[in-house]
Amino acid sequence: LKNLGVKNRSRLFQIPPHIEYLTVKPHMKRYMQVSAEIYGTLLKYVAPEDVHVYSIDEYFIDITPYLPLYKKTPRQLAQMLLDAVLAATKIYATVGIGTNLFLAKIALDILAKHAPDFIGYLDESLFKEKIWYHQPLTDIWQIGKGIANRLHKYGAYDLHGITMIPEAKLYKEFGINAELIIDHAWGREPCTIADIHAYRPIKHSISHSQILLRNYTYEEVYVPMRELVESLVLELLQIKGVTNHI
């Protein structure tokens, strides 16, 4: 769509007139149901402690212990999971394989979605070959426009360019966040799924939201509001949390 002149999050009147399109109302409830079906399918092959639910449609899976179990290579195991999801939901999924969480995410975002088999693979050497000079920087996970513009001031327009900036300057510009930027510029990511599961924040809050397609009356908004509260209560139970404020 970008090649046709449609920017991300464009409004309808901003779409070029020569492009034909359909407007379809979102069905978030159905989206969540399919997401749950996909997650349930994955759990037939891997244990929940080896899965990190990153978003409603993305999961990180540590497949290391399953390679000898299923006697498959990483790509073969990925294909097995893709086939299982397709058979269960009729959804064509994509997979990014990497030797750490960052490389797996980048393999998904930049390589897998353009691969004929919907699978992307990166290790440290392939990262330097295929990703180091990739532009724009905003395609890279966790680099938004603000961070990219600040890096441009130092002449960095790709990850390789970041490695050319003295680390002292990066720490002065970004503070402690420079450590993450530097690690990712070299294709490193020390955090593991086990680390994520073991993390316990000192303060924790949870929230849900729902986009309404029109203005609701008080009576109408009661039902979705109640559903949101009930979902939050269930999430509190899962994390064994308590609250005195909603």
Model-predicted segments: where are they?
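Gly/Gly-Pro- and Ser/Thr-rich, intrinsically disordered tail segments characteristic of DNA damage-repair
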Residues: 1-183, 193-195
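DNA-contacting surface of Y-family translesion DNA polymerases
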Residues: 152-246
